[in-house]
Amino acid sequence: MPRLDIFQSLWAMDSGRGSHPSASTEESFALVKNAGFAGMAIDLSAADLDAAYKTAPLFRQYELGCVINAYPASMEDVLPVLKMAREFDAVVVNIIAQVVPSSVEEASLMVQDWMEEAEKEDVNIEFETHRNSVTNDLGYTTALLEAVPDMKLSVDLSHYVVDREINLPLRRDETELFDKILRRADAFQGRISSGQQIQLQLEFPQHQKWVVQFLDWWEAGFRYWRKRAPGTGTLIFQTELAPPEYAMTGADGMEMSNRWEESLIMKGWIEDLWKRLEKEEIEATVTVDKEHT
């Protein structure tokens, strides 16, 4: 049966001001392990390779899976990340390519080259939907997916919502574009945005319409993934509630919510959603079996 693994971002464990009690990298690993996460994601925009390598013993000590979020601009940048992925036995490398080619054809050639190199090194890579990257634009990315049918996608919709200044309710053309992305999603990242803010507080009343929208998107994406996934496939969902300046702060510089608590809230939402989909499939199978007996 397909499995859900929820990862927490080490970058999100940056305590900021007033976010959560973690005071060290090791304490962050302990918190994540004790909270029942399957693994931790290293963000190479927040730490260089040397600093990231220092976390290797903690992955072993706390028996957590590893995801690497990388920001290469060339094949020369990709190669050391693939080496690191092998040494960390990373489940996947999320590529946020720091290149924005002018044409889909040019982008598709780059993506295929990087995919081929990763395949040679036996490393699983996915391209994350992210601003200021090869997947910067929603429409451009759907065209790129058509050009590269085997391109794997790690979907963070928060970037497209704020990039396009999306308003609710969605227009039909927006719904169709988001649906194309969700149909190709191989993994998901958890952050909720609006058309004006990249990261919203999860429990503020004024943000609930966006919470509902993102939960609807994640449910649709999960359903698409489960339909095409092998019976032993694993879906990775990464909670990534980032520190300031992603997180909003008041005039005193203090964050307006506790991101660690919000990560646990989001983790609970995703677990509940997954269980509901599993229950639906089991009930549907039982019904079909009864009809054939």
Which residues make up each language-model segment?
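N-terminal pre-domain/capping segments
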Residues: 1-86, 90, 268-293
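Flexible glycine/acidic-rich beta-alpha junction loops that bind and position SAM and/or redox cofactors
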Residues: 15-16, 162-165, 192-207, 233-252
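A short, acidic, amphipathic alpha-helical segment used as a generic capping/interface helix at domain edges
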Residues: 173-176, 210-234
